[in-house]
């Protein structure tokens, strides 16, 4: 068995904390995915740096947990309805330190070089339970339901030959990706200060002020029943996550191709989103045979931090400060399958994405939350794209996370991944470039959760591969991964190229 130690970390200064603190789960938190997230940061490290890195992370976490205070404790029911992140004076957060770098275990656990060669694939890691804090891996599961007192967070430092895989677990109610990125940058700055003996970063108390996202609820007898909790659509097939790379030069070509001739502005995001939607629909249409006159479900997570204006919010505000705009409910006319595939020009489809994104405002969000406040059981309102039929897409944009610039004092991450052993069909994660230097052509990476038996059709498609480079299998469903023997390029899908 690998050597492992667990620390039960108190937030710095815990001795003087109140006996109990409760941080309300916001009305908006209920609309996110009811699951755990586990993001892994990958560091390149010499053996001589590892012990010190573990101590630095421990000290940095103690200070950061005293700032992002809702990370310490459990989610509990409130007596008057709803839920709260509940921190008691003696609450702790588990920090595991595991050593997977013994020479005799070289055939059991990958090195940093092995991970780098496979673009930091979860398949290369093998059984994610070895690298994680069960049951806090991604996926809708009873342990994550807020009525079951879920633990809010845990951390695990896995030292490997040549590096470190630092796994950060948190309940999705705790943070969206940009809230998590704010937490990571705060942690990195705290670690950097500990290493260099410099002043620690400040923490804006408004980072925990999410009162504007908590709407007044009517009396219990005036509330209404919401929909049944969403379940996975029966038509879905076994999925896997495929990793693709869009070089910056190719993204620029796509934007030029998708820009309307009338001078209407679109973004690079609009261009690649339109291209993705068109081609993923075109390639799979012969299999799923959608009615050309029907419409498809497109959902994108919009970061509201930049869209809040009355008043503005600090960039590191915690919780879920995002809104999932969906094509069926947005005040924009949806395209049909035929229009998505070919009848609309790429410019028209990109312009639709821009109108969809622009339809999300602080005012629209407020109206939605006022409606949500009237629902009796808000836990049934969580977003679940695999409850929609095949060909549905939920795209989440991580481009502003900028994790590779976070200097922990002992190293900067080479990249990060949302580690997965459960595939939610229809999800697309847009990762920021690993190399942010202007002269580099390294662009965004895309983890596309796709039907396994159709994967090779996408990888080999000429129109798709003209822009998107295949980088290998990013993740497989746990039941399938056991058949893969922990190696990439198995199960009939080619490895990275």
From Swiss-Prot:
<feature type="region of interest" description="Disordered">
    <location>
        <begin position="477"/>
        <end position="497"/>
    </location>
</feature>
<feature type="compositionally biased region" description="Low complexity">
    <location>
        <begin position="485"/>
        <end position="497"/>
    </location>
</feature>
<keyword id="KW-0479">Metal-binding</keyword>
<comment type="similarity">
    <text>Belongs to the trichothecene 3-O-acetyltransferase family.</text>
</comment>
<feature type="binding site">
    <location>
        <position position="303"/>
    </location>
    <ligand>
        <name>CoA</name>
    </ligand>
</feature>
<dbReference type="GO" id="GO:0016740">
    <property type="term" value="F:transferase activity"/>
</dbReference>
<feature type="binding site">
    <location>
        <position position="386"/>
    </location>
    <ligand>
        <name>Ca(2+)</name>
    </ligand>
</feature>
<comment type="function">
    <text>Acetyltransferase; part of the gene cluster that mediates the biosynthesis of the tetraketides fugralins such as linear fugralin A and cyclic fugralin B, volatile compounds that play a role in the asexual reproductive cycle but are not involved in pathogenicity. One of the key features of fugralins is the presence of a double methyl group, which is only rarely encountered in fungal secondary metabolites. As the fugralins cluster does not contain an independent methyltransferase, the PKS FGR1 is probably responsible for adding two methyl groups to the same carbon atom.</text>
</comment>
<dbReference type="GO" id="GO:0046872">
    <property type="term" value="F:metal ion binding"/>
</dbReference>
<feature type="binding site">
    <location>
        <position position="462"/>
    </location>
    <ligand>
        <name>Ca(2+)</name>
    </ligand>
</feature>
<dbReference type="InterPro" id="IPR023213">
    <property type="entry name" value="CAT-like_dom_sf"/>
</dbReference>
<feature type="binding site">
    <location>
        <position position="396"/>
    </location>
    <ligand>
        <name>CoA</name>
    </ligand>
</feature>
<protein>
    <recommendedName>
        <fullName>Acetyltransferase FGR3</fullName>
        <ecNumber>2.3.1.-</ecNumber>
    </recommendedName>
</protein>
<dbReference type="Pfam" id="PF02458">
    <property type="entry name" value="Transferase"/>
</dbReference>
<feature type="binding site">
    <location>
        <position position="224"/>
    </location>
    <ligand>
        <name>Ca(2+)</name>
    </ligand>
</feature>
<keyword id="KW-0808">Transferase</keyword>
<comment type="pathway">
    <text>Secondary metabolite biosynthesis.</text>
</comment>
<feature type="binding site">
    <location>
        <position position="255"/>
    </location>
    <ligand>
        <name>CoA</name>
    </ligand>
</feature>
<dbReference type="InterPro" id="IPR051283">
    <property type="entry name" value="Sec_Metabolite_Acyltrans"/>
</dbReference>
<feature type="binding site">
    <location>
        <position position="221"/>
    </location>
    <ligand>
        <name>Ca(2+)</name>
    </ligand>
</feature>
<keyword id="KW-0106">Calcium</keyword>
């Amino acid at each position: 068995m690998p050597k492992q130690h667990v620390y039960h970390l108190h937030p710095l200064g815990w001795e003087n904390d109140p006996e109990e603190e409760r941080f309300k789960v916001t009305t908006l938190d209920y609309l996110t995915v009811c699951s755990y997230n586990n993001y892994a940061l990958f560091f390149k490290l010499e053996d001589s740096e590892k012990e010190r890195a573990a101590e630095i992370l421990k000290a940095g976490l103690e200070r950061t947990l005293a700032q992002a205070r809702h990370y310490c404790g459990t989610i509990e029911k409130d007596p008057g309805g709803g839920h709260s992140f509940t921190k008691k004076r003696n609450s702790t957060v588990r920090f595991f330190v595991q050593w997977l770098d013994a020479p005799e275990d070289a055939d059991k656990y990958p090195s940093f070089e092995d991970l780098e060669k496979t673009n930091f694939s979860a398949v290369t890691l093998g059984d994610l339970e070895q690298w994680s804090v069960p049951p806090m891996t991604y996926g809708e599961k009873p342990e994550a339901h807020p009525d079951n007192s879920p633990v809010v967070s845990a951390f695990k430092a896995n030292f490997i030959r040549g590096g470190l895989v630092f796994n950060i677990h948190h309940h999705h109610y705790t943070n969206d990706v940009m809230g998590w990125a704010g937490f990571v940058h705060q942690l990195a700055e705290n670690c950097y200060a500990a290493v260099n003996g410099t002043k620690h970063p400040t923490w804006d108390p408004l980072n925990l002020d999410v009162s504007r996202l908590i709407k007044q609820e009517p009396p219990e007898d005036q509330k209404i029943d919401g929909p049944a909790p969403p379940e996975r659509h029966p038509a879905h097939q076994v999925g896997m996550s495929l990793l693709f790379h869009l070089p910056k030069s190719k993204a620029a070509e796509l934007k030029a191709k998708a820009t309307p001739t009338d001078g209407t502005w679109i973004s690079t995001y609009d261009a690649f989103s339109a291209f993705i939607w068109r081609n993923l629909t075109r390639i799979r249409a012969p299999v799923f045979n959608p009615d050309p006159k029907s419409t498809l479900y497109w959902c994108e997570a919009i970061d509201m931090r930049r869209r809040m204006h009355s008043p503005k919010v600090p960039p590191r505000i915690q919780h879920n400060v995002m809104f999932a705009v969906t094509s069926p409910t947005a005040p924009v006319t949806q395209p049909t399958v035929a229009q998505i595939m070919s009848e609309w020009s790429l410019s028209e489809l990109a312009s639709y994405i821009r109108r969809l994104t622009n339809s999300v405002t602080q005012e629209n969000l407020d109206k939605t939350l006022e409606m949500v406040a009237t629902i009796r059981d808000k836990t049934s309102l969580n977003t679940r794209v695999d409850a929609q039929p095949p060909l549905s897409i939920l795209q989440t944009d991580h481009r502003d996370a900028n994790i590779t610039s976070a200097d922990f004092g002992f190293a900067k991450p080479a990249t990060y991944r949302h580690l997965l052993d459960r595939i939610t069909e229809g999800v697309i994660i847009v990762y920021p470039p690993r190399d942010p230097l202007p002269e580099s052509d390294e662009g965004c990476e895309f983890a596309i959760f796709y039907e396994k038996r159709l994967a090779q059709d996408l990888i080999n498609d000429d129109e798709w591969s003209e822009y998107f480079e295949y980088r290998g299998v990013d993740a497989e469903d746990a039941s399938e991964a056991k058949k893969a023997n922990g190696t990439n390029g198995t199960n009939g899908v080619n490895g990275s190229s």
